[in-house]
Amino acid sequence: MKRISIWLIAIILSAVAGIFAVQIASAPSPEEIQITDTPVSNDGNCAYMWAYHNAPELTEKLSATFLAIDPVITVRAEYFGEDCVYADGHSTFGAMETDFYIRIPVDDLTNEEALGNWMSQVLPVIVQLPREEIQGKYGFVEFTFEKTETDRAIVRVPIQLYINSNGITGAKLFQMFHNFP
């Protein structure tokens, strides 16, 4: 009885495999794709590319503000967005967010309280900028605390998360964003 059932299973599997083989062999072949050269017109289509653009007026304004707080702080503002690059080479820029880069020389990279206090001095200045000076949405503030050229800590703070943090300062502020993904 066992032999008959084994033979029966083998015959059924062979029949099913044969049916699939016939279907595949008799399937119509795909149409051949023909490529033709067509002239490209500059009808407004463009290729989008991620881009950063300096914000010199905003950088200058913030530099003057931070000079009054502490002359060791350096700042740079940039707009992040997309360049729409046309076939003829010209491009237009659309800002998606405004980002800020802050460099502060420090003596001790392990003093989280002091680093957080630096952050709590700088962040309110950024948040209080008139909304019309910010292109796109709030981006981030990237702090580079620099002891030497190679010994530094970089902390990136998403501005909206800072706004939602309800006035945290000092070590808690630093720790909140130091290992933030």
Predicted regions located by residue number:
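Second-shell loop/turn segments in exported
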Residues: 44-52, 102-119
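Polar/charged, Gly/Pro-rich intrinsically disordered segments
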Residues: 22-23, 51-107, 131-181
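Short, non-transmembrane amphipathic alpha-helical segments
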Residues: 112-135
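N-terminal Sec-pathway targeting helices
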Residues: 1-12
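Ser/Thr/Pro/Gly-rich low-complexity linker/stalk segments immediately outside membranes or between
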Residues: 24-45
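Hydrophobic alpha-helical membrane-insertion segments, chiefly the h-region
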Residues: 14-24
